UniProtKB/Swiss-Prot annotation:
Belongs to the UPF0449 family. It comes from Rattus norvegicus (Rat). The lineage of its organism: Eukaryota, Metazoa, Chordata, Craniata, Vertebrata. InterPro entries: UPF0449. Keywords: Phosphoprotein. It comes from the Eukaryota. This is UPF0449 protein C19orf25 homolog. The modification Phosphotyrosine is found at Y63.
Amino acid sequence: MSSKAKKRVVLPTRPAPPTVEQILEDVRGAPAQDPVFTALAPEDPLEPLPRAEDSEVQQEQIYQQSRTYVAMNERLRQAGDALRQKFDGLRQAGQRLEQDISQVTSATS
């Protein structure tokens, strides 16, 4: 039997999405230990304090992140300045174009 002769399987229709009330009822009925609520829960405060090496590594990571942030912020500021200059140039070109159009229109009248 060839693949063209096979019958297509008809899938059941997709159910309607739940309403807001149904979602809220489901969330309210979930136990406190549900993974939805525990996945983002704060970590256990009884964990041992980090070692000095871990703290130094973390400080270095934070320092590097802050350097990256400052550099990206500077690039963003420069890009904003360049965009502003290009906008002003386009606005001036548009004004010149409107003047030229009005001159051509008045010259042909």
